[in-house]
UniProtKB/Swiss-Prot annotation:
Record-linked Pfam families: BTB (PF00651), zf-C2H2 (PF00096)
Name recorded for this polypeptide: Zinc finger and BTB domain-containing protein 10
A GO term for molecular function: telomeric DNA binding
Span of domain BTB: 330-399
Any single GO BP term: regulation of transcription by RNA polymerase II
Glycyl lysine isopeptide (Lys-Gly) (interchain with G-Cter in SUMO2) cross-link, renumbered residues: 182, 434, 449, 463, 536, 639, 651, 663
Keywords: DNA-binding, Isopeptide bond, Metal-binding, Methylation, Nucleus, Phosphoprotein, Repeat, Transcription, Transcription regulation, Ubl conjugation, Zinc, Zinc-finger
Job of this protein: May be involved in transcriptional regulation.
Segments of skewed composition (Basic residues): 40-50
Source species of the chain: Rattus norvegicus (Rat)
Tissues where this protein is expressed: Expressed ubiquitously.
Modified residues annotated as Omega-N-methylarginine in this record: 100
Length: 836
C-alpha cells in the first residue's frame, strides 16, 4: 500500500479524514488502512473515482476495486452527519468564497495539509485567489457548475484523481476585497442617487466631483491633507454628506454642471486608458475616467449616463441672456429712473404678472403700443437683480439689496420672489452682532456698505452688512456722528438755537456725567442741500446721510416705553448751529438703516462737528427751510425712521417754545436755564404739552402725540369697504357704522332708542356721549355751559378716550355726514352693548 502524494502511507498527515479515521492513498490507487484519531473535526474527503455521488444515495460497488467495495460503503455511511437525511457529503465540504466577479476559482492541484482542523485554509494552485472557506449547508446549494479536465474543486487534503468533471458548490460574494471596497459599496447605493456627479477612486480611496474634480475634503477645508482611504473613514457619515451638499450648491459646481459629460455618448475607459465598449448596467461596474471598475452586490446604474434635466433650461436661458446683453432681438426697453434695460417681452411676461397684464391685456386694447415702458419705481439696483433672475433663475440677494428687490418684486407682482426676500430678511434679523461689532463702523448710506476708517471696505465690516440693512433705527444703540464730508455750510440754511443740557439728559445718566466732566461741545448738524428731482419719481426732496456708528461695549440703557428718549449731550451756553447734511437718495433709503439687534430703545449720543456761534448767527432766520421731522418727528417729507427716535420714543412738546417757531424737534430760541417746576410756574408745565400749531393743550404725552398726527396730514388707516383714509384707528371704526344698514342708538340714561346718532350724542370737540338731549337738560339745569364744565363727573366716558380730554375738533368725522356721534350703540333693543 503506497503512501499518498502528500501523506506518509497509513494514517499520514496528508491523508483526508473520514468519520474520525485517517486514511492515506495515492491518486487513483488503493485505500489506506484506517487508523484511529482522537482529535480534530471530522472532515470529508473528496470523492475518489467511483465514490458516493452528489445526490446523497448510497454508492454502488461497481466503481470500487474488488474486495474493497463493502468497506468503502460502510465508511461512507459512518461519515454522514447524525440527524441529516439524504444529504450528500459534498454538501458539507468547506467551500471557497474568494474571488471578485467571477466566483470561486478552480483548485487544479493538491490541497495543503488538513490535519490541523482550521477552517481558514487556502488552496494552492488553481485559478482562484486566496479567500475564505465557509461551511456549505443544504440551503446554500443554490448554484453549481460542472468542472472537467484536470478535476473539480475539492476539499483540502484530498487525493482525488483527474478525469470526469464533478458538481461543486459555489456561493455569491461574501465580502469586498478590502475596507476601501466595502465603503465604496455602501456609499454607492445611497449617495450616488443624490449626487450623480460623485466619483470614487480605488487608488486613493477618496470621493471627488466628476464635473469639477473637487474632493469633499477640499470643500470642507483647503488645507486638509489627503491620506488615502483614511479620509473616507474619518468623520461621521452626516459630516461627509454635509460637505457633499455644500459643494453641490456651490457656484463653482454649478458653473461646471453644463460641462458635465454624458457617459452614454462616450466610450468607457479602463485603468490602462484603453477604450472599451460601454458595459451593461446590470454588470455592476462604474467606469469613471481612468478608474477601475467597482463591483456591487445589487448592481449599479450609472447616473451620469442619464441626461441632466436642467441642462437644456440652463443653456436656453444662458443664450437668451447673452442676446439680451448684446441687444439681439430685444423687443422692449424698460426705463427705470432714467436707466434703460433691454429685454424680451416673452421672458418678462413669463416671469411677472405685471408685465403679463401690461403686454397681453393692454396690447389688445391698444395695438400700437410703444416698445418703451416706464416703471414708476426708483430702485434701479433692485430691478437689475430681478431682471437677472428672469434670465438666469438665480436670485442674488445681499444685505444691501434685499429690501429693494422685495419692493420691485412686489411692484412686478412676483409673489415667490417677495416671499424669498422676506425669509432672507427674517434670517438676517436673527444674526447677533454684539460679539463681532467693531468699535467704529462707517456706513455709506448711498451704497449701504460698511466702510473702514481708511475708506476701504473691510472683510470684517462686511459680515455685519446684513444687520445694518435690516434693522430700523428705533432699535439703534450707538453713538451717531453725521459727517460733514467737507461740504461748506450755506448761509441762510442754518437756524440758531440756544440749548441747555438739563432739559435733554436723563438724571443719573453715566454719559451725562462724563460729558459734563470733560466739557465736550457737540452739535447736531444738518445741511439742507436737497435738490428737486425731475421725472416720475413718487418721492422727491429726499435725503441721504453718512453715519459713523460708535458702538461702546456696554452702553445700553433700556428706557421704558413711556419715558423720554433723550440724547445725553452737553451743550455750551453760547449759541450753536443745528445742521444736518441732506442729499437726494432713492425712496427706499429711509427703510434700511439699522442698529444693534434685540434691544428696544437705547440712549443715543448725537455727535457732530461744532459750529461757531458767529456762523450760526449769520444763518439764523431760516426756519422755513426745515420740514417737519428733522429731529425725531413725523412728516411726509421726513422718511419715518431715519433718525433713531421716532414718535414712539420722542415725546412731542416736552421742549417748551413759541408755537410759531417750534417745528417738530427744532429747539426754540428761548431756552430756559432752569426746570419750570422749580419756579412753581404751572403755565410752563402746561405749555410742555401744548400743540405748537394750535391752541390745544394735552394732558398726557400720548394724547399730544396722537394730536400731532392730525397736523402732519398722514392718514394711515383705511376703510376696507370704501377705501377712505383716516388718521386714527378709532375713526375708521366709527366710520364703518355708516356702511351698516340697521343702526339703533340707545340713551345711556333713559334707555330710549334713537335711529340717528345725532339725536343721542352731544358734540364737544371730538367727544360724543350716548346721552340724549332730554336727559342732559334734566341732569344739568345750567345748559350746555354747565355740561362743558362738569363733563368729567356727570357722564360716563368711553374707555378708549379716558385720557383724551378736550381734543380738537375732528376734521375727518365732519365728512361722514349722518354719523356725527360717538354714542354707544345697541344692535337690537335689549341686545349687547357695542362701543364705538
Amino acid at each position: 500500500m503506497g503512501p499518498g502524494r502528500r501523506g506518509n502511507g497509513i494514517g499520514g498527515p496528508g491523508a483526508p479524514r473520514l468519520g474520525g479515521l485517517r486514511r492515506g492513498g495515492r491518486r487513483g490507487g488503493r485505500q489506506g488502512v484506517a487508523a484511529p484519531l482522537g482529535h480534530g473535526r471530522p472532515r470529508l474527503a473528496g470523492r475518489r473515482r467511483g465514490g458516493p455521488p452528489a445526490s446523497g444515495k448510497e454508492p454502488s460497488d461497481s466503481g470500487l476495486p474488488r474486495g474493497r467495495r463493502r468497506g468503502s460503503r460502510q465508511q461512507w455511511q459512518q461519515s454522514r452527519p447524525p440527524g441529516d437525511l439524504g444529504v450528500a457529503p459534498q454538501a458539507f465540504q468547506w467551500a471557497r468564497a474568494g474571488g471578485r466577479g467571477s466566483g470561486a476559482g478552480r483548485a487544479g492541484g493538491e490541497g495543503v495539509d488538513a490535519g490541523r482542523g482550521v477552517p481558514e485554509l487556502q488552496h494552492r494552485g488553481g485559478g482562484g485567489e486566496p479567500g475564505r472557506w465557509q461551511w456549505g449547508g443544504r440551503r446554500q446549494r443554490s448554484s453549481s457548475r460542472r468542472s472537467g479536465g484536470e478535476g473539480g474543486e475539492e476539499a483540502e487534503g484530498s487525493g482525488v484523481g483527474a478525469g470526469e468533471g464533478e458538481t461543486v458548490q459555489h456561493f455569491p460574494l461574501a465580502r469586498p476585497k478590502s475596507l476601501m471596497q466595502k465603503l465604496q459599496c455602501s456609499f454607492q447605493t445611497s449617495w450616488l442617487k443624490d449626487f450623480p456627479w460623485l466619483r470614487y477612486s480605488n487608488d486613493t480611496g477618496l470621493m471627488f466631483c466628476g464635473w469639477c474634480q473637487t474632493t469633499p475634503e477640499d470643500v470642507g477645508s483647503v488645507d486638509l491633507p489627503q491620506v488615502g482611504h483614511d479620509e473616507l473613514s474619518r468623520g461621521t457619515r452626516n459630516y461627509k454628506k454635509t460637505l457633499l451638499l455644500r459643494h453641490h450648491v456651490s457656484t463653482e459646481h454649478k458653473l461646471h454642471e453644463a460641462n458635465a459629460q454624458v457617459l452614454g455618448s462616450q466610450a468607457c475607459v479602463t485603468v490602462d486608458g484603453s477604450a472599451v465598449d460601454k458595459p451593461d448596467a446590470s454588470e455592476g461596474c462604474l467606469l469613471v475616467g481612468n478608474e477601475s471598475e467597482i463591483p456591487s452586490e445589487e448592481g449599479y446604474c450609472d447616473f451620469n449616463s442619464r441626461p441632466n434635466e436642467n441642462s437644456y433650461c440652463y443653456q436656453l436661458l444662458r443664450q437668451l441672456d447673452e442676446q439680451r446683453k448684446k441687444d439681439i432681438l430685444c423687443d422692449v426697453s424698460i426705463v427705470v429712473s432714467g436707466k434703460i434695460f433691454k429685454a424680451h417681452k416673452n421672458i418678462l411676461v413669463a416671469g411677472s404678472r405685471f408685465f403679463k397684464t401690461l403686454y397681453c391685456v393692454s396690447n389688445k386694447e391698444s395695438p400700437n403700443q410703444n416698445n418703451t415702458t416706464h416703471l414708476d419705481i426708483a430702485a434701479v439696483q433692485g430691478f437689475s437683480v430681478i431682471l437677472d433672475f428672469l434670465y438666469s433663475g438665480n436670485l442674488v440677494l445681499t444685505s444691501q439689496n434685499a429690501i429693494e428687490v422685495m419692493t420691485v418684486a412686489s411692484y412686478l407682482q412676483m409673489s415667490e420672489v417677495v416671499q424669498t426676500c422676506r425669509n432672507f430678511i427674517k434670517d438676517a434679523l436673527n444674526i447677533s452682532i454684539k460679539s463681532e461689532a467693531p468699535e467704529s463702523v462707517v456706513v455709506d448710506y448711498n451704497n449701504r456698505k460698511p466702510v473702514s476708517r481708511d475708506g476701504l471696505t473691510s472683510s470684517r465690516d462686511q459680515k455685519i452688512a446684513s444687520f445694518w440693512a435690516t434693522r430700523n433705527l428705533t432699535n439703534l444703540a450707538s453713538n451717531i456722528k453725521i459727517e460733514n464730508d467737507g461740504c461748506n455750510v450755506d448761509e441762510g440754511q442754518i437756524e440758531n438755537y440756544q440749548m441747555n443740557d438739563s432739559n435733554w439728559v436723563q438724571d443719573g445718566s453715566p454719559e451725562l456725567a462724563e460729558n459734563e466732566s470733560q466739557g465736550k461741545t457737540k452739535v447736531f448738524i444738518w445741511n439742507n442741500m436737497a435738490s428737486q428731482e425731475t421725472g416720475k419719481a413718487r418721492r422727491k426732496n429726499q435725503t441721504t446721510k453718512r453715519f459713523v456708528y460708535n458702538i461702546p461695549p456696554n452702553s445700553e440703557t433700556i428706557v421704558e416705553d413711556c419715558s423720554v428718549l433723550q440724547p445725553p449731550v452737553a451743550y455750551p451756553e453760547e449759541n450753536k448751529a443745528l445742521l444736518i447734511k441732506e442729499e437726494p437718495v432713492s425712496d427706499l433709503d429711509g427703510a434700511l438703516l439699522s442698529g444693534p439687534d434685540g434691544d428696544r430703545t437705547m440712549n443715543t449720543n448725537l455727535l457732530a462737528e461744532a459750529c461757531s456761534s458767529q456762523d450760526a448767527g449769520d444763518a439764523a432766520g431760516a426756519s422755513h427751510d426745515f420740514k417737519y421731522g428733522l429731529m425725531p418727528g413725523t412728516s411726509s417729507d421726513f422718511k419715518y425712521g431715519l433718525l433713531p427716535s421716532t414718535s414712539n420714543d420722542f415725546k412731542y412738546g416736552l421742549l417748551p417754545g413759541a408755537p410759531n417757531d417750534f417745528k417738530y424737534g427744532l429747539l426754540p430760541e428761548s431756552w430756559p436755564t432752569q426746570e419750570p417746576w422749580e419756579n412753581g410756574d404751572s403755565s410752563l408745565i402746561m405749555n410742555k404739552l401744548k400743540c405748537p400749531h394750535c391752541s390745544y393743550v394735552a394732558k398726557y404725552r400720548r394724547t399730544l402725540k396722537r394730536h400731532l398726527l392730525i397736523h402732519s396730514g398722514v392718514r394711515s388707516f383705511k376703510c376696507e369697504i370704501c377705501g377712505k383714509m383716516f388718521t386714527r384707528r378709532e375713526h375708521v371704526k366709527r366710520h364703518s357704522l355708516v356702511h351698516k344698514k340697521d343702526k339703533k342708538y340707545k340713551c345711556m340714561v333713559c334707555k330710549k332708542i334713537f335711529m340717528l346718532a345725532a339725536s343721542v350724542g352731544i358734540k364737544h370737540g371730538s367727544r360724543r356721549y350716548g346721552v340724549c338731549m332730554d336727559c342732559v337738560d334734566k341732569s344739568q339745569p345750567g345748559g350746555q355751559e354747565s355740561i362743558d364744565q362738569g363733563q368729567d363727573t356727570e357722564f360716563p366716558r368711553d374707555e378708549e378716550y379716558e385720557e383724551n380730554e378736550g381734543v380738537e375738533p375732528d376734521e375727518e368725522l365732519a365728512e361722514d355726514g349722518q354719523d356725527q356721534s360717538d354714542a354707544p350703540r345697541w344692535d337690537e333693543p335689549g341686545g349687547a352693548y357695542v362701543s364705538g
